[in-house]
């Protein structure tokens, strides 16, 4: 399975959703020194550790 590429809107939605989860106490999926939820989410995204998928509708 190839890695899915996300556009800027999908990436923003994924990072925002994950940052909200982290801010509510969800476990962090990678080792990081960051404390800000959005920065934690960004590092997880860069590491490919986020369990999110995007379903695109075909016309």
Curated annotation (Swiss-Prot):
Pfam family name, one: RNA_pol_Rpb6
Main location (coarse class): cytoplasm
Enzyme class: transferase
GO terms under biological process: transcription by RNA polymerase I; transcription by RNA polymerase II; tRNA transcription by RNA polymerase III
Superkingdom of this protein's organism: Archaea
EC code(s) of this entry: 2.7.7.6
Catalytic activity, reaction form: RNA(n) + a ribonucleoside 5'-triphosphate = RNA(n+1) + diphosphate
Molecular-function GO terms, alphabetical: DNA binding; DNA-directed RNA polymerase activity
Keyword entries, A-Z: Cytoplasm, DNA-directed RNA polymerase, Nucleotidyltransferase, Transcription, Transferase
Subcellular location: Cytoplasm
GO cellular component, one term: cytoplasm
PANTHER family: DNA-DIRECTED RNA POLYMERASE SUBUNIT K (PTHR47227), DNA-DIRECTED RNA POLYMERASES I, II, AND III SUBUNIT RPABC2 (PTHR47227:SF5)
Entry-linked NCBIfam families: PRK01099.1-3
Quaternary assembly: Part of the RNA polymerase complex.
Family the UniProt entry places it in: Belongs to the archaeal Rpo6/eukaryotic RPB6 RNA polymerase subunit family.
Function: DNA-dependent RNA polymerase (RNAP) catalyzes the transcription of DNA into RNA using the four ribonucleoside triphosphates as substrates.
Protein name as annotated: DNA-directed RNA polymerase subunit Rpo6
Organism for this UniProt entry: Halorubrum lacusprofundi (strain ATCC 49239 / DSM 5036 / JCM 8891 / ACAM 34)
């Amino acid at each position: 399975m190839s890695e899915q590429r996300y556009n800027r809107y999908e990436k923003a939605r994924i990072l925002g959703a994950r940052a909200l989860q982290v801010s509510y106490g969800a476990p962090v999926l990678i080792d990081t020194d960051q404390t800000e939820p959005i920065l934690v989410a960004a590092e997880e995204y860069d590491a490919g550790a986020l369990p999110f998928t995007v379903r695109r509708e075909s016309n």
